């Protein structure tokens, strides 16, 4: 079975799907949000931080993600270095998050002899393309819990987040479809969509 990449905008169901796939297939789940938090704490000069500048964080973490994916997915683990790092059969991961630049990552992964990422990864995109700003705003108010960073935002602040998220869903749909991801809309019947995805991974 291939490694799995789940990319998409916030609140599209990436973490939930990753947990479901982990339960079924046993892949280790790597949260890009958590990786970003680690970089932000360990190497602040790299400007890889949560809740800061989404575009810059995505740009700055792309080299790490590309080399990580290439090193842990190439048949011999070689890549830019001229020696093998070995392979552990059955050692599989799920990488999930929003800070993904698919074009830049594909370019780096190519240096590991992976010309088409779809041959080595299940590339899954999740968006909520059918939800407008008002629907996203209502979803925040209805489903947020105290653990969500949006929970205590004012109405105006939350509406601004919903406006940004609606635009980001459209942006991610375009980027992901252009770079080989199979994109699923989780605006409606999310459980059915997840069941379809789980059946499709190989």
Task: Say what each PLM segment does.
Residues 10:
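The conserved Walker
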Residues 13:
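Conserved glycine(s) of the Walker
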Residues 17, 21:
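Hydrophobic positions on the alpha1 helix immediately C-terminal to the Walker A/P-loop
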Residues 117-122, 179-181:
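Short glycine-/polar-rich loops that comprise or flank the Walker A/P-loop
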């Amino acid at each position: 079975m291939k490694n799995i990449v789940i990319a998409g905008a916030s609140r599209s169901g990436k973490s939930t799907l990753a947990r479901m796939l982990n339960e079924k297939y046993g892949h280790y789940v790597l949260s890009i949000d958590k990786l970003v938090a680690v970089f932000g704490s360990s190497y602040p000069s790299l400007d890889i931080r949560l809740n800061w500048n989404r575009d810059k964080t995505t740009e700055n973490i792309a080299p790490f993600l590309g080399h990580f994916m290439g090193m842990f997915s190439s048949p011999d683990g070689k890549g830019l270095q001229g020696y093998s790092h070995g392979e552990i059969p059955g050692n599989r991961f799920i990488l999930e998050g929003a800070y993904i630049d698919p074009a830049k990552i594909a370019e780096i992964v190519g240096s590991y002899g992976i010309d088409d990422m779809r041959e080595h990864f299940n590339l899954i995109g999740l968006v909520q393309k059918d939800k407008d700003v008002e629907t996203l705003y209502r979803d925040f108010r209805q489903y947020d819990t105290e653990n969500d960073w949006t929970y205590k935002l004012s109405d105006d602040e939350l509406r601004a987040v919903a406006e940004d998220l609606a635009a980001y869903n459209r942006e991610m749909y375009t980027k992901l479809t252009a770079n080989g991801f199979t994109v699923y809309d989780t605006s409606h019947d999310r459980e059915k969509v997840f069941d379809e995805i789980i059946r499709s991974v190989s």
